Amino acid sequence: MVAGSIARSYGGLSTFASMLSSSTLFAIAFAIALLSPVLGTAQTRPAERIVAGFDSTRPAERRQHRPAPLKELRDDIDALLSTPEWHGAHVGVCVMSLDGGELIYRRNDDALFTPASVQKLFTTAAALAIFGPEHSFSTTLSLDGTLLPSGEFVGNVILKGGADPTWSAAFGVDAAAMFDEWADVLDSLGIRSIKGNIIGDDDMFDDVAYAPGWAWDDLPWSYAPQVGPLALYDNAVAVSVTHPGLDAEPPQVRLHPETEYVRVIPSIRVLDSTGVTALTPLRDPSSNVIELNGTLAGITTSDTVTVRLSVDNPTAYTLWHFRAALQRRGIRFRGALLDIDDVNDVSPDERTQVVIEHSSMPLRNIVAVINQTSHNLGAEMLLKAMGWQQGQGSWDRGVDVIKAVLRREGVGSGMAIADGSGLSRLNLCTPHQVATLLARANKASWGAAFKASLAVPGQVGTLRRRMIGSRAEHAVRAKTGSMNNVSTLAGYVTTRDGEAFAFSIMLGNFIAPQSMAHNLQDLVCMRLASFSRKLGQ
């Protein structure tokens, strides 16, 4: 068991807590959780005797006085949540058995919390329910004009966005290679030059680039990108700054992907290896001129730091890179890159021909990337796509769709939803609502895809460094959430008996380090994974 079990051997938790500091309590609890047996009964006894309070020689009859397993579990979780680090903080937990919905543990489970990226559970569940796991998003390239015998195409090339978030390395897609293939298609049609415009059709969504409640100081960063139905490279650019070594030169700045769409103005002071690297980007939300200020520490040209920053106007960014692919293929272009809103008449007529229709990977794969890596742009595009299906690609309409799905699934309506990713602090929900969603999803037709989308400890994703070596490593699938003074974790855990629980752990208004919040959540998961309803197990 964990800290609570140890405390009882000292005559009660309050006595034990007075004897040890909170950090010591956590260290002991963590060590004991790691000692939790993973295999058969023959290997479990020594660890269980240690957990019971180091009394390996106590008479067998004393086991009869142990609390019932469920009470012992609750006492242990109470002990973990009662250390000084969480005094004054907002702490909520809900653990629910998937067999009949029994509430295994609850603390402040009906209080409202900021969910951070756990919000993505609502978004991805609703998307799977609305579209289905095999749904894909289509982007088209159309020609509206005439191809002359000389190989010159006179007219417009129209790139129409279909809410596909996958054109980036995060989804395993080489967007540059994809555009090169598109240029090859145009070349195969005999097009050697284009006299006209390349038009980006982004009318599937409204023109509101940011969700309500996003902080202004988040906007320069890649995790707070502008949202539209045309998205490329996560609507961001990576800026790498390399130390000049011993040369008295400024640091070298490179962009990936290489682009002239963004201009970086560096103001970086070079330090030796005893210094601290700290880079701060400044970008007006309507500009692609980035001021990069700060310091770069190191002594060799291998000392490089990379920051990922958002770009303004994702539609224009996409068109710029498509034009670059045409130029690489040798297709000359005479015209402008335009948003469809800046064109008087682009209504399809008999000349308009769709020459490329690109379909994304299935939604089940998209939500896996969104939940495992906490991909904000993908979540926001799903929200607006759901709104579009119901008549308007906006945050308001997308939120309405999500709420309707949650009501239908019995999750309830007493929550505030502002965006799809959880970046907004205007989102509010309860631990019970999150656990209920997980329980309902478990029985839904799309539930297998939803569960498979969650991160697993030790594997690719936001849990890759957590719970490793413990029983929970192979028993937990969950979604993380994190922002200043907020840390959340919600998902599924399988107990030692094979019983499945849905759980939600939500922490807010705390000043402890995020690492300590993660440790607390991990310890609760370890304790749940080691739970058995069999007395004495």
What are the roles of these predicted feature ranges?
Residues R106-A126, V367:
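Short active-site loop at a secondary-structure junction
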Residues S22-P37:
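Bacterial N-terminal signal peptides
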Residues S82-R107, L338:
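A short, well-structured edge-of-sheet supersecondary motif
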Residues M1-S21:
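N-terminal secretory signal peptides that target proteins for export/translocation
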Residues Q43-T83, A129-G412, N519, R527-Q537:
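Conserved serine DD-peptidase/penicillin-binding transpeptidase domain
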Residues G101, K120-A127, I198, L230, ...:
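Residue-level preference for non-acidic, small/hydrophobic
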